[in-house]
């Protein structure tokens, strides 16, 4: 029987999560989708809490996870508070959850992000975080970057960089499950922008007075390039 993994993509819909140099809910989703795709390519069954921008309350995440009965679960988040680096939270009881957190941490360091460590947090009911406390399988919360630290946010300021985090999470999961994969640690190459697309980007950016960061957010969406080209024609 194939292994199963549940992936939570934190926040969504009206809940943007942390917002500064990056919008957390959007980055979480790109990372989670990349993690899903890498796992399914290696024969792992995956269920996600969301695969688009929609409401995703934590109690519903936990319910869906337990109904799926996976071998492992991760909840993909990004941080705020002015810190720097990746961190992962696992249960105060240790076990496979601790192993999963440590395996993911090792892979994240390989893509160039520093780590604040693998941690636990005690609450009045045991584990502080519901995703770790109330899920029935070993579960880990991944905090990729600090969105309010410009230098740290730059570690995940393009879709390719965000996808690299997702693949790193997937490799850590596969390590924990004992499933082999390509050991290459190369970061995904940034796609080249052709002359026509670049001209459209410049035209729309100048006409609308948009910042480079805003344009990048637009281009990172699934149909962003096509939309920019249509907007460029509209302002001619």
What residue ranges belong to the model's regions?
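Active-site-proximal helix/loop segments of hydrolytic enzymes
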Residues: 3-4, 26-188
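Short, solvent-exposed alpha-helical surface patches in non-cytosolic proteins
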Residues: 188-236
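Catalytic-core environment of secreted peptidases
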Residues: 3-20, 74
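Extreme N-terminus of proteins, especially the signal/transit-peptide cleavage junction
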Residues: 1-3, 194
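Glycine- and acidic-residue-enriched helix-capping/strand-helix junction motifs
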Residues: 16-30
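Short, flexible active-site loop motifs that bind/organize anionic cofactors or intermediates
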Residues: 18, 51, 152, 205, ...
């Amino acid at each position: 029987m194939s292994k199963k993994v549940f992936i939570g993509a934190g926040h969504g819909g009206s809940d943007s999560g942390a917002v500064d140099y990056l919008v957390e809910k959007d980055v979480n989703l790109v990372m989670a989708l990349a993690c899903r795709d890498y796992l399914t390519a290696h024969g792992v069954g995956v269920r996600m809490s969301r695969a688009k921008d929609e409401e995703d309350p934590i109690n519903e995440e936990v319910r869906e996870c337990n109904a799926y009965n996976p071998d492992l679960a991760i909840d993909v988040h990004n941080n705020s508070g002015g810190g720097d680096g990746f961190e992962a939270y696992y249960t105060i009881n240790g076990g496979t959850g601790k192993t999963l957190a440590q395996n993911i941490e090792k892979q994240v360091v390989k893509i160039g992000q520093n780590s604040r460590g693998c941690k636990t947090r005690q609450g009045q009911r045991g584990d502080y975080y519901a995703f770790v406390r109330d899920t029935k399988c070993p579960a880990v919360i991944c905090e990729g970057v600090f969105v309010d630290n410009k230098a740290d946010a730059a570690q995940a300021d393009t879709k390719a960089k965000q996808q690299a985090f997702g693949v790193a999470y997937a490799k850590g999961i596969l390590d924990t499950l004992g499933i082999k994969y390509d050991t290459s640690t190369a970061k995904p190459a940034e796609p080249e922008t052709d002359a026509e697309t670049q001209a459209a980007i410049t035209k729309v950016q100048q006409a609308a007075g948009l910042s480079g960061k805003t344009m990048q957010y637009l281009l990172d969406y699934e149909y962003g390039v096509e939309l920019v080209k249509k907007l460029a024609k509209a302002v001619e």
